[in-house]
Curated annotation (Swiss-Prot):
Pathway(s) where this gene product acts: Purine metabolism; IMP biosynthesis via de novo pathway; 5-amino-1-(5-phospho-D-ribosyl)imidazole-4-carboxamide from 5-amino-1-(5-phospho-D-ribosyl)imidazole-4-carboxylate: step 1/2
Entry GO terms, CC: cytoplasm
Pfam families per the UniProt record, alphabetical: SAICAR_synt (PF01259)
Enzyme nomenclature, EC number: 6.3.2.6
GO terms of biological process kind: 'de novo' IMP biosynthetic process
Entry similarity comment: Belongs to the SAICAR synthetase family.
CDD domains: SAICAR_synt_Sc
Entry superkingdom: Bacteria
The keyword ATP-binding belongs to this UniProt entry's keyword annotation: yes
Keywords: ATP-binding, Ligase, Nucleotide-binding, Purine biosynthesis
Protein name in UniProt: Phosphoribosylaminoimidazole-succinocarboxamide synthase
Organism: Azoarcus sp. (strain BH72)
SUPFAM superfamilies membership: SAICAR synthase-like
Amino acid sequence: MATPLFESTIKSLPLLGRGKVRDIYAVDADKLLIVTSDRLSAFDVILPNPIPDKGRVLTAMANFWFAKLGHIVPNQLTGIDPESVVAADEREQVKGRALVVKRLKPLPIEAVVRGYVIGSGWKDYQDTGAICGIALPAGLKQAAKLPAPIFTPASKAEVGDHDENISFAQAQANCDAVLAEALAGTGKTGAGLAEEARQAAIALYSQAADYAAGRGIIIADTKFEFGIDAAGTLHLIDEALTPDSSRFWPADSYREGISPPSYDKQYVRDYLETLDWNKKAPGPDLPADVVERTAAKYREAYEKLTGLTLA
């Protein structure tokens, strides 16, 4: 197990920003270096304890899915070795946990696909009989499989804020407003790209869910992000189908009517719910056993899904 990395310090490249988990550096005008740290956020708060190997698991899993699903939509990968774009004494920070990616203009939405009634979708369904305004059959139980996957976009939040579910019409309006300048002269519209993103997200989820089912894992829901190049071509960016962006359930313990155990940070969320904490920064320290159990869950998810062992 490698030494945990809470925050990268790449001095040889300009730092553009830090997200909840990823640190982003400029390689040149066309490319970025994205370093996936071992930071963990819960309830949109970054917690003080890194989770060993988490960044390496997320990077390896994203690479696995980018390769498997690359025929559906282009992605951000350049194929350039991250160790080749940093100084020699910085290579250990990027080894196994970084990607050199194309610089793309992000769509201003989170592309969420749900295959099961769980989480905020379950709460919404109980209140309204719908999820994000999409009407569903009556009488569904918690964790029930939906008749078909649904696309439920969310607005993108700044670090520390919460993403908010929005209607598809609002997603189209947001894309029109934010992408108008970038799309000038391409013949494309933001609303049209939102529709492309919806179709791509459902196709990505459906093929991934079929594959995962054969490995004994249910992908209950997931979140994608998309960006465009100068021609307005849609690309899959950020991460893909990782324990941070998805809800993975072991198929052998799944049943309707309960919230199934999952291969993700739910173990941390459950622990935090036992504390007297207001879910605002700063987050509380995690006990060693919670850190270790969470690290094991991430590795197990990768190994079960891919059949590979983390190097």
